[in-house]
């Protein structure tokens, strides 16, 4: 310890002595502090590469893609907590989870987007509570009994419910489409929870939802995030994928977003995710719905509404793939590449370049040159 102190003391003295030399102008050819420096240096234009830059200096941590029991998938597989619980948990409160465990974050988040699926939002809370209209339907009563039984029966009910919705056989009597009292109630609950727990300069509770396009089992999901509060977000209910009120085409989602902004004066953005489960249609060079090549209008519209991309999440990493980045030792991180979202179609190697973020950037640069963006 003494030797260490001696070394530190020696270093400190050396620095002080060297500093005194500079101040005095000794041996380094600098003018003394009392003399003018005019004419001592060659004239030149001053330049700093960092002058004028205004980069953020504070990092905020949060989640832009969280589902609660209001969502069709999370609710199907046992989530019982709602939007208020999600915001409380994000702010650092201790909760009892849907499995009965006490849970708490090690560090509270700075922001959260509760992004429950817009299709059939609020279905599972109604089913789990034994809603009279649900139980009056034979299928609804059977699903209720299966979910209450839990275990393998509950899992079987979840799979059956999701498959029936995906295949278009979901009973109309059990649906919660936009415009229905049940849907309005669910959306109001989501909005009010965000408003209640939003605390400016401390915690930001964003209003949002997930638009869940799953054409042919191919994932084109987007999380839609509002930059607005209740007064604007409540004017229009979320966009869904089922016709005639909705669509599974991203262009139609962007049109809806434009209508919202024109009608309310508000602002929206969308964040796509899991291109790795799209089977080559998340970042294509031709329109997967029409087969047409993209034009300038498409490029500008997508860039406007989708400035961000969710590069990784629980259903696999979306940054790159070992076949696309063979020299990157981390390219095989959490790779999901067996097929599309529901595994109804297998993955082919020629699909990969249109699924991942790195090659999406390359494709974007290519389209930029071709379209003059």
Regions found by a protein language model. Give the residues of each.
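Extended, charged catalytic domains and RNA/DNA-binding interfaces, predominantly
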Residues: 25-373
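Boundary at the C-terminal end of the N-terminal hydrophobic targeting segment
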Residues: 19, 24-25
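Bacterial N-terminal signal peptides that target proteins for export
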Residues: 1-8
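Bacterial N-terminal signal peptides
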Residues: 8-18
